Regions:
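Short, basic/low-complexity N-terminal boundary segments at the transition from targeting/disordered tails
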Residues: 1-22, 101-108
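Beta-strand-turn-beta hairpins that frame and shape the catalytic cleft
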Residues: 22-28, 41-47, 128-137, 168-173
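Mature N-terminal segment immediately following signal peptide/propeptide cleavage
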Residues: 28-33, 38
């Protein structure tokens, strides 16, 4: 890690993703998409978690490793919660043609339908679902920061609207949590 001219810690130069990263490599690989986002390639099953590949409302300190139009296929996008640094409406919309499914909490699934015309699969905390051979469990995440600010108290923010994910693959267990 290095520090930029503003005194901010910044990641090293971005490693661009290529078509090869979407191929079945016989194991599980994890790619950082920037911020809280990751792509998992497990035996050729492609999962993107909280991909913010475009449409973020603040300047980024990195170059994004892949643009939505460069993504070849996604078996599922998983979204942990509705904050714009995890749920990019623009990215989700622009992945629709290559994405087979979207999985998230019930609340975020309702936003996906309303805002993006995406039929997201809503789940409760502790629910399990399968993507190929991958078992995915929604885990609790204490992230209802809106409760602390009066200006955001226009609705009740429930704990079940934010989650982490626990992925069990043939050769790896991966925990993606949110605080």
């Amino acid at each position: 890690m290095k520090m930029n001219e503003k005194g901010q810690m910044v990641a090293p130069a971005t490693c661009r993703m290529t078509a090869e990263d979407f191929e079945n490599k016989g194991g599980t690989s994890v790619y950082w998409l920037g911020g809280g986002g990751a792509m998992i390639n497990s035996q050729g099953t492609i999962i993107m978690i909280d991909p913010v590949l475009e449409g973020f409302d603040m300047p980024l300190l990195i170059d994004i490793p892949i643009l939505p139009q460069e993504v070849l296929k996604v078996d599922a996008v998983l979204v942990s919660h509705s904050d714009s640094d995890h749920y990019s409406r623009a990215t989700c919309k622009n992945l629709k043609s290559v994405c087979n499914a979207y999985h998230t909490t019930f609340y975020v699934a309702s936003l996906m339908k309303e805002e993006c015309d995406i039929d997201g699969n809503g789940h409760d905390i502790a629910d399990h679902f399968q993507l190929g051979e991958i078992d995915i469990e929604l885990t609790p995440a204490d992230h209802a920061w809106q409760r602390l600010y009066e200006s955001y108290n226009y609705r009740v923010w429930e704990d079940r609207e934010c989650c982490g994910f626990y992925l069990r693959t043939r050769d790896a267990n991966l925990v993606c949590w949110r605080f």
